[in-house]
Each structure stands twice: as C-alpha cells, then as structure tokens.
C-alpha cells in the first residue's frame, strides 16, 4: 500500500508540475539563444569594421586607446638619475652678446665702457675650479671634484621647493620672453631658484623672477663655489644661497638636464595646486601607445611606403606630439570654419557652427611621389597619392526647420551633427608657379574617395534621419569637388606680404633711385639707337638721290653723244655712283658730297655742249616734235625705272645701250653703191656681202631697228653729216621727208654694244684703202 501511495503522489505532483517545467525550460533556452545571437552579431559587426583597415588594426586591436607606456616608465622624484660635467656658479655670468647690449645702453665714453666691462661678470671669466662632475640622484644634485669613484663631495644642492627655469628668460632688452628657438643656445643656462624668490601673475600667468643688476659687485668669492671647505663661514654662506646657475658645453645635454631637474623637483606627496608646482604644470604629454604602434605598422605596410617612409614617419611623429594640444585643434578648427562658410546648406538647415574638433589618431600617409615638371623658369609640379584614415571628428551645431504639412505648425529643432571622416584618399597635385608667386597650390587630380559618417543628435539622443544625413553628405562632396578638385585648387602661403605695396608676390628689394637710373639709361640707349638708325637711313636716301640725278644727266648724252663716249661716261658715272653708295653706307658724309659735286659739274658741262650741238644740227620742227615725244616717253620710262631701282638693289655694272636714239633717213630707191662716190671704187666682192634691203614701202625704219637678225648695217651720224655736206640728193630728200623712227628703251641695265661694233665694222669697210 505504501508503494501505491507513493506512486500516486508522484504521479499527481508530476502531472501538475510538468507543464510549468517545460515552459520554463523553453524560456531559458530562448534567452540563451538570443544572447548567443546578439553576441555573434556584435562580433560580426566588429569583424566587418576591422576588415576596412585590417592590416593597420591587426596589431593594435586589444590595446586601450588611452594607454601610454612611456608614462609608466618615467622616473619622477627621487628615482631620477643623471650625471655629467657641468659648471656651477652662484652669480650669473653674462654672455658676450648681452655685454655688448649693456655697454650700448650705458651712454658712457670709451674709458667708462672699459671700466664697466671689467666690472661685469662674463662667461670668459669662468674658471676651472667652477667645473664639477655632477650626479643627480635622490632628489639632490651632488657636485664632485672629479668623476673617480672615491672623489670627494664638494657641494650638494637640494631640489625640493625649487623652481627650475632657463636663464635669462627675457631678451637683451628685457621686454619680451625668449622665443623657443633661442631657449637651448650658448647664451642661456639653467637657473635654480628658491620658490620664495619666484611668483606668478594670476591674471596673465606670467612668471615673475628676481632681477639682477650686472653692475652689482661680485661677492668676496666672485660668485665661485670654491673647492676649499676649510672655512666654516664660507660653507654657511653657500648653504644659505638662494640661486645657482648651471652652464653646459652641449646644448642637447642642456635639454636633457633641464627635463631631469624638473622631474627631480617633483614631490609625489605634494598637495600644492599652484602653477609653480611641477606636479601641476610640468606633466609630460606622452604619446598614446596604440597610435604609435599604428604609425609604425602603417609606414611598413606596403611597398609604396619604401620611398616615403621617412616623410610619413616625420609627419606622423609630429602629429602625435601635437595630438593632445590646443594648437593643432585651433588650426584645424580655423580651416574647417573657412570651408564650411563656403558650403551652401540645404533650405531646411541653418548655418553650420563648429563646436568641437577631435583631430583623430593618425596623420595622412603619402605614397608614390612623382616629379611631373621642373622648368628653368621655376614652374614645379609634383604628384603624390594621399590616404587618410585618421577618424577626424567634428561636432557641428545647426537648426533644422521641420514642416509636417499644413495642419501642423512649422517647428525649428536644434541639431548637433557628429561628422566622422573615416577615409579621404586620392591622387594629389602640388603646383608652384614661377616668380613672383608666393604660394603652393594643391588639389586632387580626380575626385577623391570620401567616406563620411554623419549622425544627427536631437535632445542628446541619436536619430536615424536619412534625409538630413544624405543632404549633408552630398553638400560636403559638392564642396570638396568645387574647391579641391582640378581645375579648382587651394593654396598654402609660404611667404606673407603684409607690408608690400603690391600684395601676393615676391618682388625685388625696393630701390626707387636705382630703378630711375636704370630707366634713364635704357631710354638713352634707345634714343642713341634711334638717332643712329635715322642718320644711316638719311645717308642712304641721299646716296640714292645722287644716283638718280646722275642717271638723269646721262639721258641727253645717250641721245646726242657718240656711242663709245656715252658708254665710257656711263661707266664712270656708274662707278662714281657705286663709290658714293659705299661711302654712304660707311657714314662718310664729306667724301659723298665731294663726289656728287664733281659729278654734277661734269654732266652739267656735257649737257650744255649737247644743247649747242642740237641747236646747230637739228633745225626742223618735225625733229623737235619727235624728240619731245621721245623725251616724254623717256621720262616715263625713267620714272618707272627709278621706282624699280628703289625696290631693287643698286647694280654696279655699266649700263647697256639699247638704241642710238637718232633719226634714220629713208633708204634710197637706188642701190647702195650709188649713194656716194666713195663706194664706186670698191670691188664687187666688198659689196657682195651686203644684200639690198627692202624698200621703204614694205618696211619702215622702226621695224628695221627692232629686227636685229635681218639688220646688217647702219648709218652712223658722221656719214649722215658728210652726206648732207656733200649735197647728196637722196639724203636731203630723206631729210625733208623726216621719216624717223626710234626703238624704245628696255628695262635692261646692261648696254648691248652690238650696234656699236657693227658701226665700226661698217666704217672700216667704207674707208678707202691707201
């Protein structure tokens, strides 16, 4: 019975609890599955994000972004240790540059300056006994006589409640603090002051230090820390001193000692909050270990980094040093504000205001540099690929106008936009134009790859509002395309011109007097060149006019003089013309005038003789009319010849006679042997070679002169005159008929002496044989 009761109890209880237990089990399984699914989804999202930059994120994946390894290794307080040779004094010894300024401002004579210079403590007065082997440990600076292991301790300087600074802190005039470039130079030293001597201006945060008069007489020991410790009085005076000055031979060692002394003056138990406390104002801004490892991995990631590894390492190291400072934040903030002011926002968004800037974790990387152009004029073009994945984040505030329709009132909502630049890469072009350009122009050669992550925040909660994010993304891409893609370029000024008359260029030094002298010299040179050119042109023009007058004087001789004399005279005239032209080219005015004067006299006399002969021998009107027509035609020909001669170069050869320009009588109807009794005695063979010319009715004299091949003889002027004197009826008849013809002058410059030779041959045949 007992077993039956137990069975019934178990059965009843099991039936009641079975369904709840099953439901509870299913619920637990569902929760476990949901947790596993969400975990796998997060891991998948994390892996997807890491795939974007898997190579650069692989080693730095599990490191805390804020971890700084150097901060853990830094030695502070009593743990600081350093040693080396230094020179220590209780009084400040002035540098030679400071002494020169002091003497200049003293306004004394030379004797007073010499005496004053002897009173001032100078660096050249430092002695060997002031040089010690210093050991920094346990928060104290121990000074030894030498660096041996058993060296005697001379002095010990406690660094607790001490202010360490670079001295002098101000320039030679004592008005402005030294620039950072002059802190670690031969002029400066390290000063150790007691905190009681130093104060700080709470308003401007300026350090107020004790003032030292260079004319103050030195102490009894001249500021020395003597190695002779026999007198207790001197030891007491030394330990009660409030300042020490440390001089170093090496400026780089001076920097190391400066940082070590500051760290040694730190006290971990100090509760002070003043700015003079090194625990407050002298905490080193160590680099983030994750960012430093990422930089090391980036510059060794690909083959393209080999040529620019040094550049990327330098830029990355400088970026990480400024990453936590306000200087870089302000610089980027200013640049972004200028760019945002140029962006046209959508109609439903107000102006964009930058509230916060996070510079990211890395600097841009530059790869594949290429020199495209470097000209002698100075034009320079450099192409390089740039890649940025530093996660620069900007918080922008604006207002959005939300319109939900006519039934609802339009509302304005304040927005905060978180814009993160995940990637910004492309081929970059740098351009430096020839002088006077003073800036570097840069732009992307093609549209860069841009990956923005924009998240609007309303009432401190993130919203997924695609209309706003897409509009802002498109506006950012449009702004980049319109300002940083070729042909649109931005610039970096490397030489500012705030005080220049003409801004935006590199000009030569301004010297108005020198510029005026240069312009005067250039104007005088141009004037001399112009006057010389005009003088030469005038001489050439005078020579051409002289040559024209000579040619005009030659015309009557060609008409009236004997052909042979005319040729000789023309040769002389041409030679004279040539000599005159050459003389003109060489600017010999005297010789040119003499030659032209002689030529004019010679031809003037010749023309007078020709005129007298013309009056005596030519009397009929028909000849005069014909000669007038010939003169008119000759004048036209001469004018055209003068025009051609002005265009063509001057020829120096003798002119050729084309026509004898004299009247030719009609051919008699009787045979030629009956014209004169001189021909009766000729043999028959002498006249066989002279065929009977055609009659006058068939051929006139002009055709006879024009057809040179058929012309075999001519009548000279002497024969015609003899015929007239002898009373030849045929010649007189021809004289009365006045049948005359002339051949017009051609444009040839050479004289064809064929006619002259034929006349000579004909005269020889007509002469009687003795």
UniProtKB/Swiss-Prot annotation:
Domain SMP-LTD: 304-504
Comp. bias intervals (Basic and acidic residues): 554-566, 679-688, 756-770
GO CC terms: cell periphery; endoplasmic reticulum; endoplasmic reticulum membrane; endoplasmic reticulum-Golgi intermediate compartment membrane; nuclear membrane; nucleus-vacuole junction
Main location: endoplasmic reticulum
Disulphide bridges: none
Record localization: Endoplasmic reticulum membrane; Nucleus membrane
Protein name, UniProt field: Nucleus-vacuole junction protein 2
Organism: Saccharomyces cerevisiae (strain ATCC 204508 / S288c)
Lineage: Eukaryota, Fungi, Dikarya, Ascomycota, Saccharomycotina
Name of the gene encoding the protein in the UniProt record: NVJ2
């Amino acid at each position: 019975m007992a077993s039956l009761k137990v069975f019934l109890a178990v059965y009843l209880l099991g039936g009641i609890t079975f369904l709840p237990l099953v439901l509870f089990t299913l619920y637990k399984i569902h929760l476990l599955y949901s947790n596993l699914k969400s975990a796998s989804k997060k891991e998948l999202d994390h892996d997807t994000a890491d795939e974007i930059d898997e190579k650069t994120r692989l080693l730095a994946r599990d490191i805390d972004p804020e971890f700084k390894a150097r901060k853990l290794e830094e030695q502070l307080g009593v743990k600081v240790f350093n040693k080396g040779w230094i020179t220590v004094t209780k009084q400040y010894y002035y540098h030679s540059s400071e002494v020169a300024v002091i003497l200049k401002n003293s306004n004394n004579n030379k004797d007073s300056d010499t005496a004053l210079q002897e009173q001032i403590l100078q660096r050249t007065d430092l002695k060997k006994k002031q040089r010690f082997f210093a050991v920094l440990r346990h928060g104290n600076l121990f000074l030894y006589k030498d660096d041996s292991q058993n060296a005697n301790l001379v002095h010990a300087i406690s660094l607790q409640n001490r202010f360490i600074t670079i001295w002098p802190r101000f320039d030679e005039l004592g008005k402005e603090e030294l620039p950072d470039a002059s802190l670690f130079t031969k002029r400066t030293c390290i000063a150790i002051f007691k905190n009681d001597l130093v104060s700080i201006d709470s308003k401007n945060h300026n350090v107020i230090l004790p003032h030292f008069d260079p004319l103050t007489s030195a102490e009894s020991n001249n500021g020395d820390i003597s190695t002779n410790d026999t007198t207790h009085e001197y030891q007491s005076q030394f330990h009660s001193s409030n300042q020490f000055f440390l001089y170093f031979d090496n400026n780089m060692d001076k920097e190391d000692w400066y940082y070590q002394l500051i760290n040694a003056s730190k006290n971990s138990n100090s509760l002070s909050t003043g700015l003079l406390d090194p625990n407050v104002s002298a905490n080193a801004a160590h680099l983030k270990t994750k960012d430093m490892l990422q930089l090391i991995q980036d510059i060794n990631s690909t083959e393209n980094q080999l040529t620019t590894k040094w550049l990327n390492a330098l830029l990355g190291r400088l970026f990480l040093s400024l990453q936590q400072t306000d200087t870089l934040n302000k610089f980027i903030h200013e640049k972004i504000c200028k760019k945002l002011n140029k962006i046209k926002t959508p109609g439903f968004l107000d102006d964009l205001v930058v509230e916060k800037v996070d510079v990211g974790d890395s600097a841009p990387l530059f790869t594949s540099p290429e020199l495209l152009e470097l000209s002698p004029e100075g034009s320079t073009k450099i192409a390089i690929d740039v890649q940025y994945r530093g996660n620069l984040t900007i918080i922008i505030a604006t207002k959005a106008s939300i319109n939900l329709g006519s039934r609802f009132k339009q509302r304005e909502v304040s927005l905060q936009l978180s814009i993160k630049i995940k990637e910004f890469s492309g081929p970059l072009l740098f351009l430096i134009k020839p002088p006077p350009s003073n800036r570097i122009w840069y732009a992307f050669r093609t549209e860069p790859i841009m990956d923005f992550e924009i998240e609007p925040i309303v009432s401190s909660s993130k919203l997924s509002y695609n209309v706003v994010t897409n509009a802002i993304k498109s506006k950012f891409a449009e702004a980049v395309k319109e300002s940083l893609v070729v042909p649109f370029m931005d610039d970096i000024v490397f030489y500012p011109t705030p005080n220049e008359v003409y801004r935006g260029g590199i000009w030569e030094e301004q010297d108005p007097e020198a510029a005026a002298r240069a312009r005067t010299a250039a104007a005088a040179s141009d004037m001399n060149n112009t006057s010389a050119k005009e003088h030469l042109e005038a001489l050439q023009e005078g020579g051409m006019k002289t040559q024209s007058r000579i040619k005009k004087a030659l015309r009557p001789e060609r008409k009236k003089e004997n052909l042979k004399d005319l040729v000789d005279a023309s040769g002389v005239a041409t030679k004279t013309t040539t000599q005159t032209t050459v003389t003109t080219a060489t600017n010999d005015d005297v010789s040119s005038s003499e030659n032209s004067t002689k030529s004019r006299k010679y031809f003037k006399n010749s023309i007078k003789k020709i005129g007298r002969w013309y009056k005596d021998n030519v009397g009929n009107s028909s000849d005069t009319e014909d000669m007038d027509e010939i003169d008119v035609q000759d004048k036209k020909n001469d004018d055209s010849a003068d025009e051609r001669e002005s265009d063509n170069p001057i020829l120096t050869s003798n002119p050729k006679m084309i026509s004898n320009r004299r009247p030719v009588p009609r051919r008699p109807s009787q045979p030629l042997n009956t014209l004169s009794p001189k021909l009766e005695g000729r043999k028959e063979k002498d006249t066989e070679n002279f065929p009977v010319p055609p009659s006058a009715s068939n051929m006139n004299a002009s055709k006879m002169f024009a057809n040179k091949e058929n012309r075999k003889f001519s009548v000279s002027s002497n024969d015609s005159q003899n015929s007239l004197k002898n009373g030849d009826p045929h010649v007189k008849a021809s004289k009365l008929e006045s049948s005359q013809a002339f051949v017009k002058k051609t444009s040839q410059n050479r004289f064809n002496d064929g006619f002259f030779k034929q006349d000579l041959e004909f005269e020889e045949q007509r002469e009687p044989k003795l």
